[in-house]
From Swiss-Prot:
Official protein name in the record: Small ribosomal subunit protein uS8
Pfam family, one: Ribosomal_S8
GO cellular component: ribonucleoprotein complex; ribosome
PANTHER family attached to this UniProt entry: 40S RIBOSOMAL PROTEIN S15A
Entry keyword annotation includes Protein biosynthesis: no
Gene name tied to this protein: rpsH
BP term (GO), one: translation
Recorded family membership: Belongs to the universal ribosomal protein uS8 family.
NCBIfam families: PRK00136.1 (NF001109)
Function text: One of the primary rRNA binding proteins, it binds directly to 16S rRNA central domain where it helps coordinate assembly of the platform of the 30S subunit.
Keywords annotated in UniProt: Ribonucleoprotein, Ribosomal protein, RNA-binding, rRNA-binding
Length: 130
């Protein structure tokens, strides 16, 4: 059985891993998941990520905690396979009045809402992280 929404699965694994105080979570790897992991690491929401395995690559995310509490307070999928959400550069949302980030898939790659605004790009809103 194939997975319907791999990005939602990735976000759920992160949410569940932090709820269970796991050190790391693993999942099947893809280019889009690696790009999202890169953005999460750059923004300080995860400690690190690495890809393991040759035939079936696995993506391992090392989760981040501060004083025993998960750094990611909320992480939610926005655009999904049944309802895609696209926004122009002027319509990009601010998550929690700028305290969180929106992960946006643009023509220049996956980036935060701030980076997309600076580059003058719109795109598909993949998820919100706060």
């Amino acid at each position: 059985m194939s997975m319907q929404d791999p990005i939602a699965d990735m976000l759920t694994r992160i949410r569940n891993g932090q709820a269970a105080n796991k050190v790391a979570v693993t999942m099947p790897s893809s280019k889009l998941k690696v790009a999202i992991a890169k953005v999460l690491k750059e923004e300080g929401y995860i400690e690190d990520y690495k890809i393991e395995g040759d035939t079936k690559p696995e993506l391992e995310l090392v989760l981040k905690y501060f004083q025993g509490k998960a750094v990611v307070e909320s992480i939610q999928r926005v655009s999904r396979p049944s309802l895609r959400i696209y926004k122009k550069k002027d319509e990009l949302p601010q998550v929690m009045a700028g305290l969180g980030i929106a992960v946006v898939s643009t023509s220049k790659g996956v980036m935060t809402d701030r980076a997309a605004r600076q580059a003058g790009l719109g795109g598909e809103i993949l998820c919100y992280v706060a």
